[in-house]
């Protein structure tokens, strides 16, 4: 199966950013039987200082059939993003 790596500022259970969160969630849910999705996002909601409830920070976890990593601010850097890309070896990257 093809691998797609998605970088998005906020992802479920975040909700304050609205449409983009829903769009990526629906895209991955609709195509999860055909594509392996890996999502890199932040561990806070839009304009929030609190970590999202119910997530693990800086660790991959399963949301439906997608793998998601919620990064804290310290881990949102070029070195970490390069490490993730090299680890996943995606067929495509969605920015």
What feature does the model see in each segment?
Residues 26, 80-83:
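Alpha-helical elements of Rossmann-like donor-binding domains used by nucleotide-donor carbohydrate transfer enzymes
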Residues 20, 77-78:
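Conserved donor sugar-nucleotide recognition element shared by glycan-biosynthetic enzymes
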Residues 5-8, 60-62, 86-88:
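A short alpha-helix capping/helix-coil boundary motif
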Residues 1-53:
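N-terminal subdomain of nucleotide-sugar transferases
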Residues 71-74, 80-81, 95:
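Charged, low-complexity C-terminal accessory regions
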Residues 28-33, 61-66, 91-94:
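Glycine-rich loops and low-complexity Gly/Arg-rich segments
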Residues 83-95:
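Short N-terminal targeting/anchoring amphipathic segment
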Residues 47-76:
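Conserved nucleotide-sugar phosphate-binding/catalytic loop shared by glycosyltransferases and other
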């Amino acid at each position: 199966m093809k691998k797609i790596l998605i970088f998005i500022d906020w992802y479920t259970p975040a909700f304050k950013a609205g449409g983009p969160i829903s769009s990526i969630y629906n895209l991955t849910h609709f195509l999860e039987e055909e594509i392996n999705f890996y999502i890199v996002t932040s561990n806070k909601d839009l304009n929030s200082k609190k970590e999202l409830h119910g997530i693990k920070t800086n660790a991959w976890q399963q949301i439906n059939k997608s793998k998601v990593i919620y990064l804290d601010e310290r881990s949102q850097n070029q070195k970490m993003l390069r490490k993730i890309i090299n680890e996943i070896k995606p067929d495509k990257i969605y920015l």
